[in-house]
Amino acid sequence: MAGPEGFQYRALYPFRRERPEDLELLPGDVLVVSRAALQALGVAEGGERCPQSVGWMPGLNERTRQRGDFPGTYVEFLGPVALARPGPRPRGPRPLPARPRDGAPEPGLTLPDLPEQFSPPDVAPPLLVKLVEAIERTGLDSESHYRPELPAPRTDWSLSDVDQWDTAALADGIKSFLLALPAPLVTPEASAEARRALREAAGPVGPALEPPTLPLHRALTLRFLLQHLGRVASRAPALGPAVRALGATFGPLLLRAPPPPSSPPPGGAPDGSEPSPDFPALLVEKLLQEHLEEQEVAPPALPPKPPKAKPASTVLANGGSPPSLQDAEWYWGDISREEVNEKLRDTPDGTFLVRDASSKIQGEYTLTLRKGGNNKLIKVFHRDGHYGFSEPLTFCSVVDLINHYRHESLAQYNAKLDTRLLYPVSKYQQDQIVKEDSVEAVGAQLKVYHQQYQDKSREYDQLYEEYTRTSQELQMKRTAIEAFNETIKIFEEQGQTQEKCSKEYLERFRREGNEKEMQRILLNSERLKSRIAEIHESRTKLEQQLRAQASDNREIDKRMNSLKPDLMQLRKIRDQYLVWLTQKGARQKKINEWLGIKNETEDQYALMEDEDDLPHHEERTWYVGKINRTQAEEMLSGKRDGTFLIRESSQRGCYACSVVVDGDTKHCVIYRTATGFGFAEPYNLYGSLKELVLHYQHASLVQHNDALTVTLAHPVRAPGPGPPPAAR
């Protein structure tokens, strides 16, 4: 067989490991087999196209980066590939499994769909809850909880003896549950939305996997599973590798994407739109990272100790009425999680506020507490007129509950929350950072803070680039070490075989007196040993380099983390100064000068003497109602920079601004809050969309996003300048 150095095959069916040398397969996995390996099996030229006739084939699974044997009856031929792979290890004859029948169900019991398994207010299917509780009781310190290998299909889901299962069996049970669902947990439609959000990197991916994009029962189950995986990752010695490993394991289980069509070879999509085979793992990794950034505190396994003393009567000493929840300074009502994040940004541990729960169930609230530099979300439950964080619910009102934990540590509710509710974020009294009392003085100080913020941002960006580069180099070194290990293993096996054969030949040549052949055999043996020693030495040097570079990488990460609080504080101060100047009527041109932003004067409306003549006053020129992102991009296609429209957002109660920047269409969420419309706190100040549009007609969006160096200059439906003479 001559020609290419290897061949690619794609798995059509799942295959579970039967022997240590076997490969686990998922549908769509790409396998690489070297030409030398097929030659060693006696495969004639052209025989590689019929893998079912080859039998067991040795190769590399591109998804798991593992080597081993797989049945040719489970794969299809894709095409040649210019990759050199080590030859196969010798192995004895072995019967080949029959090719699964097309359309035949995977052995095992298929579970009912999720709406048939549970209903809100339950947060997840009882089977999954039972498995997760069992595995968390065994402890979350093991790094080997979840491996990428496929579990055996289950035929019994009674779980009657689950308390006797070991950790590996429980982990397989959770993976089996996901595979036993009649359809993947993440639907293809939701997967497409998540892929677009991940590709555009315009914000968190999580909202793309919430209702209505992802059906309610699937969204609840996914959220429950991510909370569990977040706890597993947070207990690992190194968070980053743990998150990547969990993504690689659960990505294919959650999406169960079918293999791409076999006509184009892998990587050969002409338009570049073919989804990456790594997308499922990357998606789960991103979701876990978002979850860990704002970790939701789960209720404890056991109910908290009862309060030391029953809360006193809520009647005031002067005979007045007890304070109501609406009057509490720390209760903010129906505000979004993003607004809460902004209010708690850069605050000390123990800072808190309460808002309405996102479930919109009457009587349920969410306490957000700052702890360890992160926001902890704690659900306030309500039943029969009583409130609490978990059973038993002993407080007569939310006010009583919060007042109790202002004096008692939350550690009695959750051991990790060893703090009290110390600093309420008051809706009546917001901190005033601006100390200067004149517009010029405030503007001068804004310039100083903005310069400090830019300097810190540049330093952080440089560190981030260095961290990304070294992380990639570390991964390449780890891959090289794995290759060294595999090469050493092959050479040592070859050495053992050679040593066994050499003894027989040496004895034979000694009897024959053939000194020349004896010397040749001994020389070959010494050369092989020398080569193995060289590879060992190279691997040792690479491991030393890896340890040194990993240490440097950790130092860069520490420096980045030390910069984050400074960046957040400087941005908060800068934003307060911008809001103060805006409220005092400072002209945007002057603000832009303080910020170092060039004032654009070339748009067609810049020279209008009377602002009342602007087409922005006519909502019909820019408000287009309920259209989606794709339709908005079509309307703005080919338009000049600054052309914009306002539409309804897919987020309930919000709007979206689509604007052309550097020839591309960008999308920004417009929030509607109690204080007004705006792109972000503390800028939600505008009483209507029209007021917002008129302000940003001359104010750059760059203050919200460094990539949006544009104003809302040209309403999409406004009459524009005439075409050039050549086009008339």
Swiss-Prot record:
InterPro entries with a match to the protein in the record: PI3K_P85_iSH2, PI3K_p85beta_SH3, PI3kinase_P85_cSH2, PI3kinase_P85_nSH2, Rho_GTPase_activation_prot, RhoGAP_dom, SH2, SH2_dom_sf
Domain Rho-GAP stretches: 109-295
GO-annotated molecular function: 1-phosphatidylinositol-3-kinase regulator activity; phosphatidylinositol 3-kinase regulatory subunit binding; phosphotyrosine residue binding; protein heterodimerization activity; protein phosphatase binding; receptor tyrosine kinase binding
Impact noted for substituting Y655A: Stabilized interaction with FBXL2 and decreased half-life
PTM field: Phosphorylated in response to signaling from activated receptor-type protein kinases. Dephosphorylated by PTPRJ. Dephosphorylated at Tyr-655 by PTPN13. Phosphorylation of Tyr-655 impairs while its dephosphorylation promotes interaction with FBXL2 and SCF(FBXL2)-mediated polyubiquitination. Ubiquitinated. Polyubiquitination by the SCF(FBXL2) complex probably promotes proteasomal degradation of PIK3R2.
A GO cellular component annotation in the UniProt record: phosphatidylinositol 3-kinase complex, class IA
Pfam families named among the record's database cross-references: PI3K_P85_iSH2, RhoGAP, SH2
One annotated GO biological process: protein transport
Main function: Regulatory subunit of phosphoinositide-3-kinase (PI3K), a kinase that phosphorylates PtdIns(4,5)P2 (Phosphatidylinositol 4,5-bisphosphate) to generate phosphatidylinositol 3,4,5-trisphosphate (PIP3). PIP3 plays a key role by recruiting PH domain-containing proteins to the membrane, including AKT1 and PDPK1, activating signaling cascades involved in cell growth, survival, proliferation, motility and morphology.
Domain notes: The SH2 2 domain is required for interaction with FBXL2 and PTPN13.
Family: Belongs to the PI3K p85 subunit family.
Disease in which the protein is involved: Megalencephaly-polymicrogyria-polydactyly-hydrocephalus syndrome 1: A syndrome characterized by megalencephaly, hydrocephalus, and polymicrogyria; polydactyly may also be seen. There is considerable phenotypic similarity between this disorder and the megalencephaly-capillary malformation syndrome.
Protein's recorded name: Phosphatidylinositol 3-kinase regulatory subunit beta
Species the sequence originates in: Homo sapiens (Human)
Lineage of producing organism: Eukaryota, Metazoa, Chordata, Craniata, Vertebrata
